[in-house]
Amino acid sequence: MNWMMRELTRMGRGDVAFLLASNKTYPSYGYMIEKGATAIWELWNGDTANRWMNSCNHVMILGDLLTWYFRDLAGFNPAQPAYKQIIFKPDFSIQELSYVKASHNTLYGKMISNWKKTLTHLEWDITIPCNTTALVYLPTLDEKAVKDKDVTFVRREGNSTVWSVPSGNYHFSVSMDPSLGKNRVGIVEDQFLYEQASFP
């Protein structure tokens, strides 16, 4: 399932991944937890499915969600082995999510990604460990959004600007397009997904 969460986010549907992670109704991880699961069921309806067709002992529930949380919500992605170079690229398009606080210990020290946002503004604090560098994706097309002389504009990519950042502590404050995440395309309509899809 962790591949599903990451692929949904990669396709621009982090909102659906977030619903699967945060809802307590069927089908979702929260539904499994509400029914007492500590590991992922083979089927979304593992509590009512034929027991001969359903294993209730797959990966620990948090195992899948933590990978997605660190990679896609906090934005920690290794560009080189052992995070010698880090890509900070959270999915800011999930409108239902207003903040994330995360840290991870690497061989070079602790990296941190703490952000909070409204529909129109982002405040983001990051820590890049000593002897490492990072590429930071900001959800703005303004090539002058960052004033820090140590931070270098690299390129535009999609709805983001990419910046080269050396080790240290940084605070980014940028205006965001309020339509970010509103015009999603791909997979299926939300109404179909939750009202008509035949999930097992």
Predicted regions and their residues:
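Alpha-helical support elements that line or immediately flank enzyme active sites
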Residues: M1-M11, A134-T140
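Non-catalytic C-terminal accessory modules of carbohydrate-active enzymes
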Residues: D15-P200
